[in-house]
């Protein structure tokens, strides 16, 4: 039996309990650790080698922080010191104590970053980076063979092709993960962090200046680093302006989050996403069947110019698919062109599936992403693009109403 969460994630669970009533001490902790949070963010994204400059005074600051959240850091350090540590000289012991404290402090900073970033468009990018830098720690804990049930706990929440059980050796209830240990380690971190982020996202951040300042500073730093942030801002026919991510259905958002955080959705899920995204951008009213029930056969050039299509493909590859674990640019380009019916293959757009086919997908890997919300349950939402169109129309209606009210107020509508 192995522990699926590494030690730092266990730390996060403890911090989660300590910050349950987030308004009590969260802002004060942020205020005291603000510069360290930004330093740690820069370290994770490769722009800083350390978060500590004057360790003695900095540990004093964090001793106060741990006291605020009722965390016995000295007791924790004592537990982590080797049992025979008393044999060493005082100087050596002190050095080891400082190293342990630095690790505990870094865990706290990571947790604070997760809280903040889960309320921004950059959380997926953070998860991908974090899984990459922490994988070694997890790999060291992983044996070559693990219980099939422990394997399934992670594999069932991952869409990485290499984690399909039929591809691996299974003997006496144990899976041999020797060849895929690095991938498995990253997925342990990724799926658990995504789950943690989702839970934290449900809690509102305190509405105060220190939170706003930190979020602005994080955004200013990451907006140029994370090129695909604008992936959530596509434009649609008859609608001027960017479409917010929440206007897209949960299934599409789920696939997007998986890709951006370094996951690898199934072939069918990627195909549905690509075609949905293309139609959302150029013709969100397009559906697989016309009103007479006939299949709608169109190619990409029927709804967009070649220049627009080429730009769409380039952006999708650069902003999105480069994050996928099994990325191959040449294959990905061909695959996108084939799915939207552009220059290769049968020359017809392969439509995004109707909702009923997501729910009963016959093993295509679509049902995993089908998590209906209240809007999905409305009778007229039978296709993912219906969800988008509903939100576009709702917004346009609201804008028209605002305009009429303004004209009435100014006396221009007589």
UniProtKB/Swiss-Prot annotation:
Keyword set includes Phosphoprotein: no
Disulfide bridge partners, by residue number: none
An annotated Gene Ontology molecular function: DNA-directed RNA polymerase activity
Keyword Secreted part of the UniProt annotation: no
Cofactor note: Binds 1 [4Fe-4S] cluster.
Gene Ontology biological-process entries: DNA replication, synthesis of primer
A cellular-component GO term for this protein: primosome complex
Chain sites annotated for binding [4Fe-4S] cluster: 251, 352, 370, 376
UniProt keyword list: 4Fe-4S, DNA replication, Iron, Iron-sulfur, Metal-binding, Primosome
Cofactor(s) this protein cannot do without: [4Fe-4S] cluster
Family: Belongs to the eukaryotic-type primase large subunit family.
Protein role: Regulatory subunit of DNA primase, an RNA polymerase that catalyzes the synthesis of short RNA molecules used as primers for DNA polymerase during DNA replication. Stabilizes and modulates the activity of the small subunit, increasing the rate of DNA synthesis, and conferring RNA synthesis capability. The DNA polymerase activity may enable DNA primase to also catalyze primer extension after primer synthesis. May also play a role in DNA repair.
The protein's assembly and partners: Heterodimer of a small subunit (PriS) and a large subunit (PriL).
Name assigned to this protein: DNA primase large subunit PriL
Source organism per UniProt: Methanocaldococcus jannaschii (strain ATCC 43067 / DSM 2661 / JAL-1 / JCM 10045 / NBRC 100440) (Methanococcus jannaschii)
Lineage: Archaea, Methanobacteriati, Methanobacteriota, Methanomada group, Methanococci
């Amino acid at each position: 039996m192995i522990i699926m969460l590494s030690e730092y994630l266990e730390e996060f669970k403890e911090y989660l309990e300590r910050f349950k009533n987030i308004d009590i001490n969260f802002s004060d902790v942020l205020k005291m650790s603000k510069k360290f949070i930004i330093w740690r963010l820069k370290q994770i994204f490769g722009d800083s080698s350390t978060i500590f400059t004057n360790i003695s005074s900095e540990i004093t600051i964090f001793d106060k922080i741990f006291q605020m959240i009722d965390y016995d850091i000295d007791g924790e350090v004592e537990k982590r010191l080797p049992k025979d540590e008393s044999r060493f000289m005082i100087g050596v012991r002190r050095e080891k104590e400082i190293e342990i404290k630095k690790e505990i402090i870094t865990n706290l900073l990571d947790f604070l970053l997760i809280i903040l970033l889960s309320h921004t468009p950059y959380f997926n990018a953070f998860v991908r980076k974090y899984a990459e830098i922490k994988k070694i720690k997890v790999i060291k804990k992983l044996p070559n063979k693990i219980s099939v049930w422990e394997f399934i706990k992670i594999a069932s929440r991952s869409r990485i092709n290499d984690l399909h059980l039929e591809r691996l050796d299974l003997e006496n209830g144990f899976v041999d993960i020797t060849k895929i240990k690095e991938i498995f380690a990253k997925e342990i971190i990724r799926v658990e962090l995504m789950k943690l982020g989702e839970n934290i996202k449900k809690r509102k951040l305190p509405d105060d200046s220190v939170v706003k300042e930190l979020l602005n500073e994080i955004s200013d730093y990451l907006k140029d680093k994370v090129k695909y942030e604008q992936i959530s801002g596509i434009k649609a026919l008859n609608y001027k302006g960017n479409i917010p991510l929440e206007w897209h259905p949960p299934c599409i958002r789920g696939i997007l989050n998986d890709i951006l955080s370094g996951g690898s959705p199934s072939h069918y899920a990627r195909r549905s996403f690509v075609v949905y995204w293309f139609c959302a951008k150029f013709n969100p009213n397009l559906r697989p069947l016309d009103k007479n029930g006939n299949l709608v056969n169109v190619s990409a050039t029927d709804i967009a110019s070649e220049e627009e299509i080429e730009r769409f493909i380039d952006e999708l590859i650069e902003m999105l698919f480069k994050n996928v674990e099994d990325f191959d640019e040449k294959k990905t380009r061909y695959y996108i062109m084939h799915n939207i019916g552009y220059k290769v293959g049968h020359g017809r757009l392969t439509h995004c599936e109707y909702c009923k086919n997501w729910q009963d997908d016959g093993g295509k890997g679509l049902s995993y992403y089908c998590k209906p919300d209240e809007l999905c349950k409305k009778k007229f939402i039978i296709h993912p693009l219906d969800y988008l169109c509903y939100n576009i129309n709702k917004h346009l209606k609201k804008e028209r109403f605002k305009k009429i009210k303004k004209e009435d107020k100014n006396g221009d509508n007589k």
